[in-house]
Amino acid sequence: MKLAQDGYEVHAACANTGGFSEEQLKANEQNAYRLGAAKYVTLDVTHEYYEKSLKYMIYGNVMRNNCYPISVSSERIFQAIAIARYAREIGADAIAHGSTGAGNDQIRFDMTFLVMAPGVEIITLTRDKALSRQEEVDYLNAHGFSADFTKLKYSYNVGIWGTSICGGELLDSSKGLPEEAYLKHVTQTEEQLLRITFDKGEITAVNDEPFDDKIKAIQKIEEIGAAYGIGRDCNVGDTIIGIKGRVGFEAAAPKLIIEAHRLLEKYTLSKWQQYWKDQVANWYGMFLHESQYLEPVMPDIEAMLTSSQRNVSGTAILKLRPLGFETVGVDSVNDLLKSKLGEYGEMQHGWTAEEAKGFIKVLSTPLRVYYGIHPDEER
């Protein structure tokens, strides 16, 4: 509204990464025109987000602090890219967004716009004028825009890869989120098995129902897992600007998919494949979180992650229960546990007893040498 009053021809754009229903998108459009936009568009980048980043996050089992599936932070960059692309298409002179000066999103948006839309002015009225929510509400009311502006205790960001929750008890380090803070609640109490089938690291079936559309597969798993209240947690981490941040989230699909995928990899990858993939995946997740998706090293990491998935095919089985789940097993033609060389702790067929003793003696050589020279350092 303020920009239109200042003489700008405002083109409002909503970049959707799977977090809006049709009703919400329609309401966005109506509100945009009520606030003075000359044009409104929805830019659906959900599938682009999956193809260009989300599938690599699954390949890498990316969890920030072994906890948070970087739901919002990974989506923001694709929202920003979509907005920058649209701004170029219409020849925009400026891009405006509503970030404050207190969080990570201002960095993700501004950096992307600076790189993807060079020369285009970036307008951030909320940040520049240090506006409070109440000041924004007062301004809208004064200019005839009436709506329910009741301040929510929590703020939510919803996307295909989970929902983040901020505010309320999260501002007190000694408190956790109450049940009413979550958008989805437990409706299933009976245990059930969930089968997730992968082909080279990508989901192809859920409970033996085939899915060509990976987004629909994720949504199906979310529907199943959310009914058990699975995927709730709270992450405390370091923000890009250097302060600690605390965010609650509910992410049933990410938690179930990543743990199912990780389980399948335990059976189908070598020790060193798993080790090195974990190292580069941690870097990948950190770079996504810290607004470095456009860094030239990212495609190199993606190539390594893709290569690592060539044998990650099969079905992982999980047992779901209210507020939790456990891994059961896998069914895969690439199951390395099926080796005919031996059964762990039971019987071996690939070596003799004397060969085993020789292997152990050779393996111990470096330690025998060291402690032979430094007997006083024995532990």
Language model regions located:
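Nucleotide-activated chemistry modules centered on ATP-dependent adenylation/adenylyltransferase
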Residues: 1-379
